[in-house]
A protein has these predicted regions:
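Bacterial Sec-dependent N-terminal signal peptides
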Residues: 1-32
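Compositionally biased, intrinsically disordered low-complexity regions enriched in proline and serine
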Residues: 3-6, 11, 37, 84, ...
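Flexible, solvent-exposed coil segments and beta strand-coil junctions
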Residues: 29-36, 84-92, 149-156, 180-186
Length: 225
């Protein structure tokens, strides 16, 4: 990581600490209209699967801020077109081993809040991320096979090595949420992260738990004349 990336990473860390402190100290005030944790899962480009955990605050019914952590497993972006995975069986149970690239993304984003209905809302945000992920190197090699009656294997036609790289990325996300209870809701959203390691685009669904800021039902009273 070069000095610029280290500086940006330090700034992101300070931003995360500030946001956490701000949300913790003001969550009970009128400035924070909604405050909730979210946990989600989804999929995206590069045949990726992902898990997302974070916290989001809606401020003054106008702004939103999110601190999130994502863990992704993906097909390496530089995987050769003729790549063949290792295959075989053990105790007559077949298996396939494909090399994967793992990535973690810690993001601090902020943006706008849009009220869509009584208890539905959307957010659009952008910000910076600290990204750590695998860079996979492929080297062509000879395919070999072997078996011992109850087990057999055929190696891949590429030998692989992994390096862990770090980068600063640009994060963008848009989410749609529905608070079906005062403390719980559901959501879905899309995201992307542009960085020098591998830039995924994905979709996720999530469960949200916290202060939903649901509107109370209006009770009409009829007064006799």
């Amino acid at each position: 990581m070069n000095s610029t990336q280290k500086k940006l990473s330090y700034q992101i860390g300070l931003g995360i600490l500030f946001l956490t402190f701000f949300i913790t100290t003001t969550a009970q005030t009128k400035a924070i209209n909604k405050f909730y944790l979210h946990a989600g899962a989804g999929w995206g480009t590069y045949e990726s699967g992902l898990f997302d955990l974070g916290v989001q605050a809606i401020i003054k019914n106008k702004w939103s801020a999110t601190l999130s952590y994502q863990s992704l497993t993906m097909r390496p972006k530089n995987r050769p077109a003729d790549y063949q995975p290792e295959t075989g069986y053990v105790l007559f149970i077949p298996y396939t081993y494909e090399v994967e690239a793992n990535m973690t993304i810690t993001s601090l984003t902020a943006g706008r809040y849009f009220k869509l209905g009584k208890n539905t809302w959307a957010t659009t945000e952008g910000g910076l991320s600290y990204v750590s992920g695998d860079k996979v190197n492929f080297e062509r090699t000879e395919v070999t096979s072997g078996n011992i009656i109850i087990a057999a294997s055929t190696t891949s036609n590429y030998q692989t090595t992994k390096e862990t790289k770090s980068s600063v990325g640009v994060a963008m996300r848009a989410d749609l949420n529905w608070g079906f209870a005062s403390f719980m809701g559901l959501g879905c959203g899309v995201f992307t992260n542009i960085n020098s390691i591998q830039s995924p685009i994905g979709f996720q669904v999530k469960l949200i738990v916290g202060k939903m800021g649901r509107e109370k039902k209006n009770k009409h009273k009829t007064e006799g004349l």
